[in-house]
Amino acid sequence: MKYSNDIVIDVSVDEIIAIFENPENLKHWQPDIKSFTHLKGDLGQPGAVTRLKVDMIIREIEMTETVISRNVPDAIVLKYEADGVVNTVTNSFIVLAPSKTKWVMNNHFTFAGFMKFASGPLKPIFRKKTYDTMKQLKKFAESR
């Protein structure tokens, strides 16, 4: 399953990347993340691995986040792995004006086991949740 979302944020590209990459900011724009534990590598750099505990609608899930590549502002590629799900996310930040940035997020999910069968009806839910998260980052960044 693949999809893309984008949003325009009224802050500079450098500021939005700094906010995006700072784990201390997660509570402000990703409140469903209940814990963030850095496991290895240099935080935010290729090869870094983090364990996340995320409060989903019906239960808490644990996943790992691996930084695949970091070429800001063009692409920050992250891979998220949980039971039956792998999501590779490419985040791109495009300068529209000195204080205006377009954030484009491309998601590529692969599913295994039960999730392979359940994934079809979930696409609109995943897409909406992704966009809601992007709106939360926009709100946080613009209110600072």
Give short role names for the model-derived ranges.
Residues 1-40, 45:
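Hydrophobic ligand-binding cavity/cleft-lining segments
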Residues 2-4, 60-64, 86-90:
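Short, surface-exposed coil-to-beta transition loops
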Residues 3, 35-37, 75-76, 88-90:
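Short structured motifs
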Residues 6-10, 37, 53, 66, ...:
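Generic structural detector for well-ordered beta-strands
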Residues 10, 29, 70-71, 96:
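A short, compositionally biased micro-patch
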Residues 16-20, 26, 50-52, 67, ...:
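Hydrophobic pocket/interface hotspot
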Residues 37-84, 132-144:
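Glycine-rich portal/gate segments that line the openings of hydrophobic small-molecule binding cavities
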Residues 81-132:
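Beta-strand/loop substructures that line and gate deep hydrophobic ligand-binding cavities in soluble
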